[in-house]
């Protein structure tokens, strides 16, 4: 047994020898009984350009064409993968099962590499020896036709002519056009003839993605494919994640002229489209949308402030669109550049929303940097009064604002002449500092 295994071992090494001699090979085989240890038949079926007589000798010696190697491959699968039709024919004539499935649940028909003539010859061979049509699906739920993501028109039509169904989808609901778009080099010409063969260019997959969704989500856009798919697809059609082909173009930072192409096919510009333009700071798209009749309002300005879209803020300002409480929402976002931009454009620091002020929100966020910027822009006495009320109501830490309030009172002596303001300020400070400190100075005002 050791001698048999040793002879097989040297026969496996012979696969790596460049100048193989059939007579030498036959002599080596004389000392061998198939053991299955080295998968000899598999190894020789995987040699490109090998004379099929080597495989024939192995088959005559008793090596089975219907055994798998350690990876679950059959000799017929291996020969199909490397496009050796002569070995494919040899295996089939010696009983290889054309419907055997490898670990990926693929039959030999799934492996269609080679020129059109070679692929068509292999298809004819497999079908001639009993390959079943529409009888297998791989791990992705694809039959051989659907698994071929980048077929030539001639091969595709050949596969269809022998009975394969073209109007099918994989387990994700993707049809041939979806899958072709996911290949390395999708082509408009391929999609064009697929459409002529009746494959839907607008069918959504199980996630709601049409082929146009897929092409619009790619980093590099194929304009020819977009032009081909546009007439049959609603650019506002949302997938289950809420994205449309139009919003996907915006999210992938596509050029304005391409987005305009999709906009030109739509009668409706949705609020979602506007919101995504603002989120990605696409002021150029806002301008295109505005030219098509879409009106903006303070809600759009507010969103631009919240997400920090400086270019969109500038565009809206130039078109006299503002939000009176913009500074408040800029503080909430803690985006200093936005705060600076609004201050530069003379937005008020006296915004009050639901009883909260810009300053009280700085205290809540523990942000002394933005607080100092706001205090330098002269909030009103009423604003400071409301700030103290909001801080006390929500029991916020006063330490961050006490120095600013003290300086404010010092610079605004009229503040303490208002009993309401003074009483609030006295209580605010008294509750903060240590017991025993005298506040008689306050009594001098009254």
UniProtKB/Swiss-Prot annotation:
One of its GO terms (biological process) is symbiont-mediated perturbation of host apoptosis. It is found in: Host cytoplasm. ANK repeats lie at residues 71-100, 104-135, 207-237, 241-271, 296-325, 327-351. InterPro entries: Ankyrin_rpt, Ankyrin_rpt-contain_sf. It holds the Pfam family Ank_2. Keywords: ANK repeat, Early protein, Host cytoplasm, Host-virus interaction, Modulation of host cell apoptosis by virus, Repeat. It comes from the Viruses. One of its GO terms (cellular component) is host cell cytoplasm. Induction: Expressed in the early phase of the viral replicative cycle. The keyword Repeat applies. Gene3D superfamilies: Ankyrin repeat-containing domain (1.25.40.20). Inhibits host apoptosis. Acts by associating with host apoptosome. May interact with host caspase-9-Apaf-1 complex. This is Inhibitor of Apoptosis OPG037. It comes from Variola virus (isolate Human/India/Ind3/1967).
């Amino acid at each position: 047994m050791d001698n048999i295994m040793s002879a097989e071992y040297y026969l496996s090494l012979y696969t790596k020898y460049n100048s193989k001699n059939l007579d030498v090979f036959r002599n080596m085989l004389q000392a061998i009984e198939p053991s299955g240890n080295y998968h000899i038949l598999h190894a020789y079926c995987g040699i490109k350009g090998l004379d099929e007589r080597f495989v024939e000798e192995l088959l005559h010696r008793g090596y089975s064409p219907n055994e798998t190697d350690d990876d679950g491959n059959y000799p017929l699968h291996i020969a199909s993968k490397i496009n050796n039709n002569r070995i494919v024919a040899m295996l089939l004539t010696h009983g290889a099962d054309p419907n055997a499935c490898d670990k990926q649940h693929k039959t030999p028909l799934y492996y269609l590499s080679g020129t059109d003539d070679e692929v068509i010859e292999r298809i004819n061979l497999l079908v001639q020896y009993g390959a079943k049509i529409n009888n297998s699906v791989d791990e992705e739920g694809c039959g051989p036709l659907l698994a071929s993501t980048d077929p030539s028109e001639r091969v595709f039509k050949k596969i269809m002519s022998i009975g394969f169904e073209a109007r099918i989808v994989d387990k994700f609901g993707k049809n041939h056009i979806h899958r072709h778009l996911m290949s390395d080099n999708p082509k408009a010409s391929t999609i064009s003839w697929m459409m002529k063969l009746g494959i839907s260019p607008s069918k959504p997959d199980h996630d709601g993605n049409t082929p146009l969704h897929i092409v619009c989500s790619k980093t590099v856009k194929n304009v020819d494919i977009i032009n081909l798919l546009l007439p049959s697809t609603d650019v506002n059609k949302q997938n289950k994640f809420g994205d449309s082909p139009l919003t996907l173009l915006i999210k992938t930072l596509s050029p304005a002229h391409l987005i305009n192409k999709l906009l030109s096919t739509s009668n409706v510009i949705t609020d979602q489209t506007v919101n995504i333009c603002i989120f990605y700071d696409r002021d150029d798209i806002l301008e295109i949308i505005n030219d098509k009749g879409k009106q903006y309002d303070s809600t759009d300005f507010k969103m631009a402030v919240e997400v920090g879209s400086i270019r969109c803020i500038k565009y809206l300002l130039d078109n006299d669109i503002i939000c009176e409480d913009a500074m408040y929402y800029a503080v909430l976002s803690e985006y200093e550049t936005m705060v600076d931009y609004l201050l530069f454009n003379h937005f008020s620091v006296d915004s009050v929303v639901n009883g909260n002020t810009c300053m009280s929100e700085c205290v809540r966020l523990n942000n002394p940097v933005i607080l100092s910027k706001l205090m330098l822009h002269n909030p009103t006495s009423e604003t400071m009064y409301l700030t103290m009320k909001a801080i006390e109501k929500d029991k916020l830490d006063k330490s961050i604002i006490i120095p600013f309030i003290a300086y404010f009172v010092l610079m605004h002596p009229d503040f303490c002449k208002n009993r309401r303001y003074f009483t609030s300020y006295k209580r605010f400070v008294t509750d903060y500092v240590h017991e025993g400190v005298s506040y008689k100075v306050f009594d001098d005002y009254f």
